[in-house]
Design a protein with these regions (language model features):
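Short catalytic/metal-binding and nucleic-acid-binding patches
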Residues: 1-179, 185-186
Length: 186
């Protein structure tokens, strides 16, 4: 599958969306950064406050979240993995609002948080996000495995289930408040 900057996304289709830190810099330095990004994603997806058990764990009250969520069900989150210098999202578009609007809000919001927290000036993300259209179920399942194995392949953990910042616990029923649509993969 070719990766490119998608300008148009289609209703009922799925996409692998990813981006990394500018100059390959780490953009997630501590648990608060990972949780903040995931919390922003959940809010934008219209999930209930406290999805993924996040909210009570966020301690930085100076960096408040100011986001308008999309209606629940506008997008489907199939799986995700947040790594120190990049992120992967496997998303479905369920309506007319393009995934690009979701990612723009997510990246802008997280960049504002990151720049304020670390007194950083300039771009946080290297470029516009990249996306690949998921053409068939076989590729979708392969991509889910690729996304979940990322931390293990990178040598960050010994087992995939040890990485806290992915949807893998949703898939092995280790998270009570699972947020991903597992039906497409399992």
């Amino acid at each position: 599958m070719g990766y490119r900057d998608y300008k148009e996304f289609a209703t009922g289709e799925y996409y692998h969306v990813f981006n990394r830190g500018n100059d390959k810099m780490d953009i997630f330095h501590d648990p608060q950064d990972y949780l903040n990004f995931l919390h922003r994603l959940c809010v934008l997806l219209g999930m209930p406050r406290g999805a993924l058990g996040i909210g009570s764990e966020l301690t930085d009250t100076k960096l408040r979240l100011r986001l308008d969520s999309f209606d629940a069900g506008t997008f489907s989150l199939v799986c995700y993995c947040i790594m120190p210098n990049h992120f992967h999202l496997l998303l479905g578009q369920n309506g007319d609002i393009p995934i690009s609007k979701l990612i723009l809000r997510l990246a802008t919001s997280y960049s504002m948080y990151f720049n304020a927290k670390y007194a950083h000036v300039g771009h946080v993300f290297q470029d516009r996000f990249k996306a690949a259209h998921i053409a068939n179920d076989k590729y979708l399942r392969h991509l889910s495995a690729y996304i979940h194995l990322n931390p293990k392949v990178a040598g960050l953990v010994k087992t995939t289930s040890d990485w806290k910042y992915s949807s893998y616990p949703d898939y092995i029923d280790k998270r009570e408040d699972a947020v991903c649509d597992k039906s497409l993969v399992l």
